[in-house]
């Protein structure tokens, strides 16, 4: 089964992202707006308890942190994807790095660019038109992230939360 690790932003930020995703993201119905921390990976059922334990340890080792969205950007020419760019933060980078150490495999395909996808698989014209329009808008949002989620993929391709992990030491 496929698993992944992500963080889900607050409802106001999800609503803002979804206002674009419903038009520009074919994965809109498969998963809510999120920041991918660990791309999909396969696990056998017997491996799950040790992975859950490791994600819990990682989460406990990172304190809650600010998530700041500050502009719209694209991965063009690598892919025709539109996203809300998230300002880098050491805790966010630490989560990503820790989720790419043993027992997890390293992501060799892309470097980590914190973002929230709002459109993908767009034609060049769609990308250009929307990027130009969205860059004129002031996109500014900040919130505190205090949890991450381990997700699993259902047979229909959608993703659902397996377990939520609070960040930082429990009091």
From Swiss-Prot:
Pfam families, sorted: 2_5_RNA_ligase2
Keywords of this entry: Hydrolase
NCBIfam families listed in its UniProt record: PRK13679.1
Enzyme class: hydrolase
Protein EC: 3.1.-.-
Active site as annotated: 34, 115
Signal sequence bounds: none
One term of GO molecular function: hydrolase activity, acting on ester bonds
Gene3D superfamilies attached to this UniProt entry: Cyclic phosphodiesterase (3.90.1140.10)
Motif HXTX 1, residue range(s) on this chain: 34-37
PANTHER family: PHOSPHOESTERASE SAOUHSC_00951-RELATED (PTHR40037:SF1), PHOSPHOESTERASE YJCG-RELATED (PTHR40037)
SUPFAM superfamilies given in the database record: LigT-like
Family to which this protein belongs: Belongs to the 2H phosphoesterase superfamily. YjcG family.
Motif HXTX 2 mapped to chain: 115-118
Provenance organism: Halalkalibacterium halodurans (strain ATCC BAA-125 / DSM 18197 / FERM 7344 / JCM 9153 / C-125)
Protein's name in the database: Putative phosphoesterase BH1439
């Amino acid at each position: 089964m496929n698993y992944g690790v992500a963080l889900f932003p607050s409802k106001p930020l999800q609503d803002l992202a979804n206002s674009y995703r419903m038009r520009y993201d074919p994965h809109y119905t498969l998963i809510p707006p999120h920041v991918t921390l660990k791309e999909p990976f396969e696990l056998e059922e017997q491996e799950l308890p040790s992975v859950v334990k490791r994600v819990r340890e990682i989460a406990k080792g990172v304190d809650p942190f600010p998530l700041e969205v500050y502009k719209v950007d694209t991965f063009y020419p690598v892919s025709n994807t539109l996203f809300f760019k998230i300002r880098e933060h050491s805790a966010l980078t630490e989560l990503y790095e820790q989720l790419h150490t043993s027992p997890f495999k390293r992501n060799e395909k892309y470097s980590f660019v914190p973002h929230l996808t709002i459109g993908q698989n767009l034609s060049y014209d769609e990308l250009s038109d929307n990027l130009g329009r969205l860059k004129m808008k002031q996109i500014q949002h900040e919130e505190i992230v205090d949890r991450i989620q381990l997700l699993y993929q259902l047979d229909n391709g959608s993703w659902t939360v397996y377990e939520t992990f609070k960040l930082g030491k429990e009091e």
